Amino acid sequence: MNQQTITLAVAAMNAVHDTERNLDKYARFVAEAAAKDARLLVLPEQSLQGYLYHLNHALSPEEMNYHYDHAEPVPGPSTERVAALAREANMYIVFGMTEKVAVSSAGVLYNSAVLVGPEGLIGVYRKVHAPGDEYHVFRQGKDWPVFDTEIGCLGLHICYDLRFPEAARELALKGAQIIILPTAWPQNVGAQYDLFDRARAAENECWFLSSNQVGTCDQGQLTYYGHSRIIGPLGNIVADTGEDEGLATAEVPRDRLRRRQWGTLNIFRDRRPETYTSLASEDIYHALGPTETESL
């Protein structure tokens, strides 16, 4: 193993609504990444139990029951199994799941991204921005944690968070050197994904890893875009899975991973936060008025 470089990996995965089958696929991706000496593997949003059947539809009692019945706590049985894979492979793994928090008799569900590593469970991020029918299933998170690891400081956000540049910027300002995005991004809006993930890497001058679901959902009508990617600090795509299920990897010099690539322009030095007075205002939406949103 080259101590001067580190290998990063992202998976494009056709997740199903069957936790055991998805865990089996996790194990195969971990083995493939480990064979390439990867130290970090990112798996998609909701890839443990499966995502919503659709984004804008009438949720059936059967679907609601599925999400509640298959949700798990963190830590829990599945996080322990993935943590065991991480220990065995000496790897950091990020994966998306439906998390259940016992604050009531039924529990509260979150769309969460979990980080495990050789040392076990490291942390969890709960999705802050909820699109479409996620409002009816998941409670929204309230913060943007970053996690210091042996390979650098990692910041997590999920799917729809990508549409909000403040999310990645908050992670970068907190010290994230690698910004990670598990996602279930639909195929029909792939052009936006192509734009946003490269922009977030470039505007924060850090590495950006996105892991997307791919193919058609086994329940409902959603088809996912794939194109899980490793993107450099200049917004350049270093590795891409394309439209098929699989793994993309990149070997990166450690000194390029652990520091931002300052050039002539230093965006963090040159920021003028005192002028961005509308960013934290809760009244702007009401002033602009609601708009029609595209059906996904």
Describe each model-derived feature in a short phrase.
Residues 106-127, 222-242:
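Amphipathic beta-strand/beta-sheet edge segments enriched in Tyr/Trp
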Residues 71-94, 162-248:
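CN hydrolase (nitrilase-like) catalytic-core segments centered on the catalytic cysteine
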Residues 1-40, 180:
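N-terminal active-site segment of His-dependent metallophosphoesterases
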Residues 34-43, 132-204, 208-211, 290-296:
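Active-site beta-loop-alpha substructure in enzyme catalytic cores
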